[in-house]
Amino acid sequence: MALYEHVVITRPDISPAQVESFIEEMTTFLKEKGATVGKTEYWGLRSLAYPIKKQRKGHYSLINIDGPADAIHELERRQRIAEDVMRYMTVRVETLSDEPSPVLSRKERRRD
């Protein structure tokens, strides 16, 4: 099976709890399709580089996936028709890291 990093941007008007619930739904779906879900990260409400669907902010989330391409295609199909999803991107990678992503670690450094 291949390794993927999947980043999704959801609408800013939903709560972080709803975003976590949405990520759980995606995780459950992927497990049903035979994929293994590694690390999931919620990066928070962040400003977008340019407006998407008349929105200037969005909730960013990352999911590491080890699974078949069929599961990824179906996940992307579902996100294309989901109203809460503004953008998504899936990238195939050579290895998955268990360490916090650079985006999340930079966010933690700012708090200190």
From Swiss-Prot:
GO terms for molecular function: small ribosomal subunit rRNA binding; structural constituent of ribosome. Pfam families: Ribosomal_S6. It comes from the Bacteria. Keywords: Ribonucleoprotein, Ribosomal protein, RNA-binding, rRNA-binding. GO terms for biological process: translation. InterPro entries: Ribosomal_bS6, Ribosomal_bS6_sf, Ribosomal_S6_plastid/chlpt, Transl_elong_EF1B/ribsomal_bS6. GO terms for cellular component: cytosolic small ribosomal subunit. HAMAP family: Ribosomal_bS6. Belongs to the bacterial ribosomal protein bS6 family. Binds together with bS18 to 16S ribosomal RNA. This is Small ribosomal subunit protein bS6. It comes from Hyphomonas neptunium (strain ATCC 15444). The lineage of its organism: Bacteria, Pseudomonadati, Pseudomonadota, Alphaproteobacteria, Hyphomonadales.
